[in-house]
């Protein structure tokens, strides 16, 4: 790719190809992931914004706190260069993913926490940077997490903890979320 964001997305495409076993005997396709890549290509941001160091997995579970103040940031294996919105959207999406899981299991979760507009406004007030193209970056976060969840599910199949589904899209734990995002009905 010719920009840090293009390289980032191309890296995710390569990870997807590896995850699905491209070229191997057990190769399969995930239509939901491929539809999301197509959506991202079709809606690519006109202005990607400035390039910064992206944490990659910035979320509450990867921070250490002392007296309610963050003192350490953990889990840097997804670090890269790219727009700030990569981290903003990842934090919002991952919280929403776990919120949806909590509700699915009849738990209240924290529905008023890390809401997209609140996070964007707080980020702007603290940094002076206005988050742009947040819908695009949230879709990209959902895609990235979908590929990670696919790989996690594949390991469960490999170790005999579950069967390989007839529909590979079922490997994506939040498939319904991505479908609703693609339809414009999730947020």
Please provide the spans of the model-predicted regions.
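Regulatory N- and C-terminal appendages and interdomain linkers associated
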Residues: 155-187
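Solvent-exposed, charged/polar functional surfaces in cytosolic regulatory/catalytic domains
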Residues: 11, 15, 39, 43, ...
């Amino acid at each position: 790719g010719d920009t840090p964001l293009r390289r980032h997305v191309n890296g995710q495409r390569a990870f997807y190809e590896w995850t699905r076993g491209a070229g191997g005997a057990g190769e399969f396709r995930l239509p939901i992931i491929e539809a999301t890549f197509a959506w991202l290509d079709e809606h690519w941001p006109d202005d990607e914004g400035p390039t910064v160091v992206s944490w990659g997995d910035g979320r509450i579970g990867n921070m250490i706190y002392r007296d309610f103040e963050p003192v350490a940031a953990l889990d840097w294996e997804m670090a890269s260069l790219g727009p700030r919105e990569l981290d903003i959207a990842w934090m919002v999406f991952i919280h929403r993913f776990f919120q949806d899981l909590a509700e699915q299991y009849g738990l209240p979760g924290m529905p008023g926490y890390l809401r997209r507009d609140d996070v964007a406004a707080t980020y702007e007030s603290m940094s002076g940077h206005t988050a742009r193209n947040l819908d695009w970056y949230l879709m990209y976060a959902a895609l990235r997490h979908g590929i990670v969840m696919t790989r996690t599910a594949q390991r469960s199949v490999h170790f005999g903890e579950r069967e390989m589904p007839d529909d590979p899209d079922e490997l994506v734990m939040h498939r319904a979320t991505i479908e609703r995002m693609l339809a414009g009905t999730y947020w």
